[in-house]
């Protein structure tokens, strides 16, 4: 039996539930696609794909609510500052609700602008519009859940976000099946099922807080909610994460767009190969969350020894997992692609690009882990700098080599982008490891 020391146990106690939560995220969309896939028209599947893409982009951009809340909460937890821990949750939820109601107020221009750029059939656009106009009302629940998830992780508790994610999937399946097949509501039923699951998750997050953190209610101080210095710090951290996310979205969307411009076979190949990156990212993000929680905790406690030990252990896990994924993909990667498609043209075309996939784990694992450590340290400005340099390099490499290398230039640019993020943050990370809580990033 493998014996784990206390540090590794703490890492896994946060990482494993986070990995489970990550894996359940795409299940919400997969469930919707599976249900509408039996309604007799491909337009329903297209509508879910388009609507899901819109919400992925919108909510991805506002993911700073989870990350910023996690880093600052973990530091306050490390300082045993329960008043600040409470204020951070209120601040984050308040900002999230403000953004959500702004999205609701602007839903019609957002929809019109989005469909100006999305070229699809009239039927798909009509159905996607129905899906969007129902699901957009879930914005308060989704952004509220971001705040709760970040707060729970900052409190060293990733189990609650996992419980919430599992509950959401169960509710989504039950309500969607009832409305679609029981009441014949078709895509509206799927949208309402998703909406119901989102609010069920928010209610559960609040009830868990009341049940297990009720002692914090007496620490609510509304007069300190708008403390200027604290609000400035909150928005400073989240501003950096917001722009970092914009860079990440730009690279991700461009990767798909550049592949599509090279034809449907190349687009299909890139889409399939990126599934292997996505699978790896779900695992590494779990350890990044552990980095957020533990790095922030030890920085808040001024415990550099524990911080250094945690970073070493995180990178031990990261290196081991990246080597394992490289070996796994080299042995069974092509077989995995065969499970995703039976198009021999696509599978054959993917063979010439597969070595780029083998480079992803070793090139990318440090970027994931340093992201978590930097978020825990609230060193978001440095993280943004690394992302800007890596993103600019991505575009320079692609446009510099696409004429001679074609799609290989796109993959080379992506691998370099991952590698540069890790290398730059590794260099800057030396300063972070020497941080005191009073030191600015």
Residue ranges and their predicted role:
Residues 1-15, 73-140, 182-242, 295-360, ...:
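Short alpha-helical transmembrane segments in multi-pass integral membrane proteins
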